[in-house]
Amino acid sequence: PETQKSKLDSSRLFQQIFLCCSITGTLLLGFALGITLHFSISTFQTQLDDMLKTTALSLADSAMVREAYHQGYCTDEMIHYFDTLVDTADNMDVLTLSDCNLIRLYHVNHALIGEEFVGGDQGDALAGKSYFSDAIGTLGLQHRFLTPVRGTDGSILGFITVSATMTCIN
């Protein structure tokens, strides 16, 4: 009877230790996965923001883009260049060039060229600031970077918006 009781106590102790270790391991694994997911999302967001910002600032400083604003339209070659840029860039879904009257000189949906910019978040860009914004455009909810396009004299000609749709981000 004593040995049976000690075996039973040993068995219970083993079960308790096993259960405790299993719970601790599961909690540690969940914590590690949570930390990894957080850093992965953070890294993705940083890379996305860098790409949107770099693209917009590079285009805004381009002589080709300034030429489009001075002409009041994009040539077929410019449209092809912008189309290719959007098609080949990871996570960039929308590129828009708009003048100070909010008229689009370029949009990925060519039917929207000549139409008014949508989103209502362009005010600071027209005031000379560059910034990120989340707004609803013609292609839905977007994470955007907006920046002014300046003439060689420093005057604001319009603005560029480079966006990733939230469906792309999610």
Question: Model features per residue range: what roles?
Answer:
Residues 62-116:
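Extracytoplasmic/periplasmic helical hairpin
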Residues 157-158:
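Short beta-strand edge/capping elements of PAS-family sensory modules
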Residues 35-66, 73, 77, 81, ...:
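Membrane-proximal extracytoplasmic alpha-helices
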Residues 7-38:
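Extreme N-terminal signal-anchor transmembrane helix of membrane signaling/transducer proteins, especially
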Residues 144-154:
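A short, hydrophobic, proline-anchored segment that marks a local hinge/packing element in signaling
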Residues 107-140:
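Extracytoplasmic/periplasmic sensor domains and loops in membrane signaling proteins
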Residues 1-7:
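N-terminal Lys/Arg-rich, disordered targeting/topogenic segments
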Residues 75, 139-142, 161-170:
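Helix-start (N-cap) segments at beta->loop->alpha junctions
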